[in-house]
């Protein structure tokens, strides 16, 4: 199976993202500065019948962070809100 990548710009750099990564980034960007729940992200990517994808979400977020962040282990843009979801920030927000 061949993965198709789409190019998009983020924080002044061009990124090659998979369809799943792009869908996640779009959902987070639409809600920039606000928490997006795990359920909302899964539904946006995999549809209403996303049961079983919750663990996959973390893997895709990690891959997205590796592309977005200078230091993926200490993210400045894509923040985890423990027990709730994720938040895309402008980099300086907590």
Q: Model segments located where?
A:
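Short, intrinsically disordered, low-complexity terminal/loop segments
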Residues: 73, 93-94
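HATPase_c (GHKL) ATP-binding subdomain of two-component histidine kinases
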Residues: 88
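Short boundary/linker motifs that mark transitions into or out of structured domains
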Residues: 1-11, 84, 92
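Catalytic strand-loop-helix junctions within cyclic-nucleotide turnover domains
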Residues: 49, 92-93
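Positively charged, aromatic-enriched patches within helix-turn-helix-type DNA-binding elements
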Residues: 12-77, 82-84
């Amino acid at each position: 199976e061949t993965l198709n990548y789409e190019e998009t710009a983020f924080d002044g750099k061009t990124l090659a993202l998979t369809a799943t990564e792009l869908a996640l980034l779009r959902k987070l960007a639409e809600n920039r500065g606000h928490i997006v729940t795990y359920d909302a992200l899964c539904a946006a990517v995999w549809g209403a019948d996303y049961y079983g994808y919750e663990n996959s979400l973390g893997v895709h977020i990690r891959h997205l962070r590796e592309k977005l962040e200078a230091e993926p282990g200490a993210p400045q843009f894509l923040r985890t809100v423990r027990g709730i979801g994720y938040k895309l920030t402008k980099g300086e927000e907590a």
